[in-house]
């Protein structure tokens, strides 16, 4: 269970982030790897203060739940980031003779977006709580999101980068948007026609079935021109900075009776964004019970990416 306090945020949206793999690791006392698609069976929200049906404050506790879009683009972008991270580590380890040099709980972990990165460790970064609202103990723990190091120039200067899935790169490339990076380095389709050679519209066989020369030219133009360009943006992939950089809303609703049950969805990497808008100035404690589907990965349904 997670808890959200909305004091002082009346009429404004409060954004929270949670990492299911992180929460599971803390409450189960063993590592749950992030590189999986975690299946959420259902979520239930409860609130201390809520709008009654017919009341003008009905939208007081509006909830949106969003995730990384479950697409081949996001999957390939994640895999490219993972392979870059892993291969670099392997190359360095090959140059050493020290056994067991890699950290015992090493795992490839990324942020949902750059805001998630900058909010990490703050009250915007949700952690599990018990029935009394006590946050899980994190003393002595180490949940470190992955970094990669690139060479800035031939002089040997290096740059360390965090990694996030959605949106633009951070300022000075402090964090790399994996989907944007994937799109920047991948060959794309052509938008022009495959050939511009002239066609003789008076050719006898070309005019078979056509009433006249003009009809043949029109039909041929439709055949060659319509749907020649792809049915999507050529240069920008969904999830980069110029094409739907936000997370995908998978559930939404209004807590108007003190309780809001929502259905299931799949959270890539177990990453979720929760947006809540409340009309109450006083502290409104909203609790979120996340029920995961049972499965074969340490008790939960979480297929490897």
Predicted features by range, described:
Residues 1-28, 303-304:
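N-terminal leader/pro-regions and domain N-caps
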Residues 24-30, 47-53:
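Short amphipathic, basic-aromatic surface patches that mediate peripheral association
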Residues 32-39, 57-59, 266:
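Solvent-exposed loop and beta-edge segments used for protein-protein assembly and interaction
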Residues 35-51, 272-275:
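A short beta-strand element within beta-rich, extracytoplasmic domains
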Residues 80-226:
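Low-complexity, serine/threonine/proline-enriched polar segments
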Residues 199-261:
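Intrinsically disordered, low-complexity segments enriched in Gly and acidic/Ser/Thr residues
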Residues 265-281:
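Short, hydrophobic/proline-enriched secondary-structure or compact coil segments at domain edges
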């Amino acid at each position: 269970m997670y808890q959200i306090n909305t004091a002082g945020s009346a009429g404004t949206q409060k954004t929270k982030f949670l990492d299911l793999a992180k929460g599971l690791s803390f409450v189960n006392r063993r590592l749950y790897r992030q590189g999986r698609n975690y299946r959420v069976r259902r979520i239930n929200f409860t609130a201390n203060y809520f709008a009654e049906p017919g009341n003008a404050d009905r939208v007081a506790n509006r909830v949106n739940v969003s995730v990384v879009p479950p697409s081949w683009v996001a999957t390939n972008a994640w895999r490219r980031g993972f392979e870059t991270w892993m291969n670099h580590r392997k190359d360095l380890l090959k140059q050493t003779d020290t056994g067991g040099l890699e950290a015992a709980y090493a795992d490839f972990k990324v942020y949902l977006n750059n805001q998630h990165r900058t909010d990490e460790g703050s009250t915007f970064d949700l952690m599990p709580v018990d029935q009394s609202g006590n946050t899980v103990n994190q003393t002595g723990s180490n949940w470190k999101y992955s970094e990669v190091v690139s060479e800035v120039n031939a002089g040997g200067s290096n740059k360390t980068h965090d990694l996030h899935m959605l949106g633009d790169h951070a300022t000075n490339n402090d964090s790399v948007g994996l989907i944007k990076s994937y799109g920047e380095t991948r060959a794309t389709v052509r938008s022009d026609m495959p050939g511009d050679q002239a066609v003789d519209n008076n050719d006898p066989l070309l005019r078979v079935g056509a009433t006249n020369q003009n009809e043949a030219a029109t039909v041929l133009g439709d055949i060659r021109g319509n749907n020649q360009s792809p049915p999507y943006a050529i240069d920008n992939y969904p999830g980069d900075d110029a094409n739907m950089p936000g997370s995908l809303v998978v559930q939404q609703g209004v807590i108007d009776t003190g309780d809001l049950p929502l259905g299931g969805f799949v959270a890539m990497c177990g990453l979720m964004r929760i947006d809540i808008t409340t009309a109450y100035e006083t502290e409104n404690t909203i609790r979120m019970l996340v029920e995961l589907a049972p499965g074969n990965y340490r008790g939960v349904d979480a297929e490897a990416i």
